[in-house]
Design a protein with these regions (language model features):
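Class I (Rossmann-like) S-adenosyl-L-methionine-dependent methyltransferase catalytic domain
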Residues: 1-34, 44-57, 63-104, 145-244
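Conserved acidic residues
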Residues: 35, 111
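Conserved beta-strand/loop positions that form the S-adenosyl-L-methionine
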Residues: 40
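A glycine-rich helix->loop->beta "capping" turn
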Residues: 106-109
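A conserved beta-strand element that flanks and buttresses the S-adenosyl-L-methionine
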Residues: 114
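Short catalytic micro-motifs in class I SAM-dependent methyltransferases
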Residues: 117-118
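Helix-capping/helix-break motifs at membrane-protein junctions
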Residues: 123-124
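A short glycine-rich, Lys/Arg-flanked "PGG" loop and its adjoining helix->strand segment in the class I
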Residues: 128-140
Length: 244
């Protein structure tokens, strides 16, 4: 396994120009203006940068397990609702509470639940558990919109990593060494792990997960593929799914 010395905490708080409103509006018909929205893994409220003119801020709730992200979000968008989700995560909130569900801290129901690049950093079982929990927070006819990384984009992500070699001392990876017959790919910041759902993630400092499009429904059988949002929305490497 090749060593990749990245600091995962450096990658979480992001204030970027992604048009997340258009990402989640891709191939959907949502009454955004009247929708009650939960942004699961909201970071610093990045969805609102492009969406604030299309939604009512008082109908928006963002939760994140990074306390600093929540503090920044509250300053940026004081009219919206932000809640610190004190759940354990090996990279982003090691002191947090294990097995803390979103439904444990939220009492309301929502028309739309968003999760941008959340499951990029979750094991398969975590993804399944989280989505099952979030389904219980939906109003009738509500839906969850979420993105995952596609294995088809791995080469692009690999190139992105290599462009950061100088800054982060990342050794060049040999993509050809990775076999593509498996459902899931683990890209760990310390090691490369291929299709190892039984790996003790407590030993990993951080990771990314890539899914094969044709096999993702083995993981989430009822998820509907909504396509790949245009890259000019700033959503490189992401594919969009809907779950009701």
């Amino acid at each position: 396994m090749r060593m990749i010395n990245l600091r995962p905490d450096k990658f979480h708080i992001q204030d970027d120009n992604k048009n997340l409103y258009e990402v989640f509006n891709h191939n959907t018909t949502i009454d955004w203006k009247n929708a009650k929205i939960l942004d699961f893994g909201c970071n610093i409220g990045n969805f609102l940068i492009s969406a604030q003119d299309y939604i009512k801020l008082e109908n928006y709730t963002g939760i994140d397990l990074n306390l600093n992200s929540i503090k920044m979000a509250k300053k940026k968008f004081p009219e919206a609702n932000f809640i610190f989700y004190d759940k354990w995560h090996i990279s982003y909130n090691p002191p947090g509470t294990k097995d803390l569900k979103a439904s444990d801290i939220l009492e309301e129901k929502y028309d739309v639940i968003l999760a941008y690049s959340v499951f990029t950093h979750c094991t398969v079982s975590e993804t399944q558990d989280i989505l099952n929990d979030l389904l219980g927070l939906l109003n009738p006819n509500g839906q969850i919109l979420f993105t995952v990384l596609s294995d088809k984009e791995f080469h692009g992500f690999y190139n992105w990593i290599c462009t950061h070699n100088k800054q982060y001392n990342v050794p060049k990876l040999n993509v050809d060494d990775i076999e593509y017959e498996n459902v899931v790919y683990w890209i760990d910041y310390d090691n490369i792990i291929i299709d190892k759902d039984d790996v003790d993630m407590n030993e990993c400092s951080g990771f990314c997960v890539f899914y094969k499009l044709q096999n993702f429904n083995k993981v989430i059988p009822n998820a509907k593929f909504l396509g790949v949002p245009p890259k000019d929305y700033g959503s490189s490497f992401q594919t969009l799914y809907c779950l009701k």
